């Protein structure tokens, strides 16, 4: 466990470097939210991201999540923190939008992940269009779409080598907002070899079963391969930064061309 003084020192260091801190937790229950908020307040973070992991029929799962969000609103809406719920493989875009709207919580918005809608049997641009009015944060990654029986899985890969419409997604997201950018944070997630199966299917009824799942993780290799894998993780992360910069430069050049012609 990290003590309060260590968390405070971490926050102080981030501020000296002119960095913001976002806390992320892979659940939405009371205990997980309380722990994440406590860390956020001790570090001086600005935002807490969460996503639900419940098993049950869709309507029951949505009801549980709505209760979780109500707890966040009633307990922490005056904390000074903002909150994001991430679309994370099991819920469809319109279901997430409904949760945010019905919460009537001004400090709650959506975190858009480049690939997580695939497992809910949606495609990136369609999901983005549905979620767009409520997106304030983004996880950038690339992935290969894996066709499964009646649904879709995704296997994360090196950015630029997958099926995600990388440039189109970035362009849409950058353009959100009128007088100022709507998206305030982009997280780069290079999760090479992470795999997530299909959770929603073409032939499902209007109240499908949502299976329980563990929090997302990429399996580690055997011990003798671990050092090489960790070196590759660092290389992959640097490559992703360079890829995103190159795509942003392309977008900038095209925008300048349109403005000047």
Named regions from a protein language model:
Residues 113:
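Active-site glycine-centered loops adjacent to acidic/histidine catalytic or metal-binding residues
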Residues 7-10, 66-70, 143, 147, ...:
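Membrane-targeting and insertion segments and their boundary/processing signals
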Residues 93-107, 118-261:
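Histidine-acidic metal/acid-base catalytic patches
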Residues 9-109, 119:
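Active-site acidic/histidine proton-transfer and metal-coordination neighborhood
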Residues 2-4:
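Short, small-residue-biased leader/transition segments that mark boundaries at the very start
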